[in-house]
């Protein structure tokens, strides 16, 4: 096991991961953020360098953690050989198994392999799997049309940390203190876009997570069918692209409104799927918010 700390090697790794798109996109986004100030206090673990077979990004061990905060306690995985992934987890302390955490990736064997590792280590864990369509936005070469935002309001801008409570209340995965803190950190660290009404309150928004993934795109019910979601998505994609980041996202199979929106802006549905595992030790099973 190797924790890659050298800044030169981390930039080399960033370029190496491009040749493994789209499966490496989650790890690639995390590595890009590490190389640009590392606001989420992540680090890279590999089986070897430079001829690696598996890469895992994780929270730095010295970073402050909350054992119930699976949003922040999230690992991104890319492997060339699934056996190398299993071996790394079985033989080394790559993961903190004593807290609620996530494993994210774009490879189909992730769930079965992670479950096998937990069994081999005799761990009493509940593993919750969610699978999504993975998407990538085409280059947004021009500023999205926002001429319909006439007058001083509504206006296109970005989120502030004070908006985190609204996002926490409206996100299907939110509604708890861990999520509130996580969303506030995302807003503080990464690009966001929102439309605000005449009172300055957000009515439509999108944010970016620790893996440079566009997420939590949402419009309040009273403000739907006005073109806000499309405007927010394209503006956020363009903002990420202008900074050199991939404009990637995920969508549930039954979220037809979002799927139709993505089709309308010519987003590419990737051949791989996004897999999110939430792993909960038995000791936290009644406390965790999934």
From Swiss-Prot:
This is Glycine-N-acyltransferase-like protein 3. It catalyses: an acyl-CoA + glycine = an N-acylglycine + CoA + H(+); (9Z)-octadecenoyl-CoA + glycine = N-(9Z-octadecenoyl)glycine + CoA + H(+); hexadecanoyl-CoA + glycine = N-hexadecanoylglycine + CoA + H(+). Its EC number is 2.3.1.13. It comes from the Eukaryota. One of its GO terms (molecular function) is glycine N-acyltransferase activity. GO terms for cellular component: mitochondrion. It comes from Mus musculus. Signal peptide: none annotated. Catalyzes the conjugation of long-chain fatty acyl-CoA thioester and glycine to produce long-chain N-(fatty acyl)glycine, an intermediate in the primary fatty acid amide biosynthetic pathway. Pathway: Lipid metabolism. InterPro entries: Acyl_CoA_acyltransferase, Glycine_N-acyltransferase, Glycine_N-acyltransferase_C, Glycine_N-acyltransferase_N. The keyword Acyltransferase applies. The keyword Transferase applies. The lineage of its organism: Eukaryota, Metazoa, Chordata, Craniata, Vertebrata. One of its GO terms (biological process) is lipid metabolic process. Keywords: Acyltransferase, Lipid metabolism, Transferase.
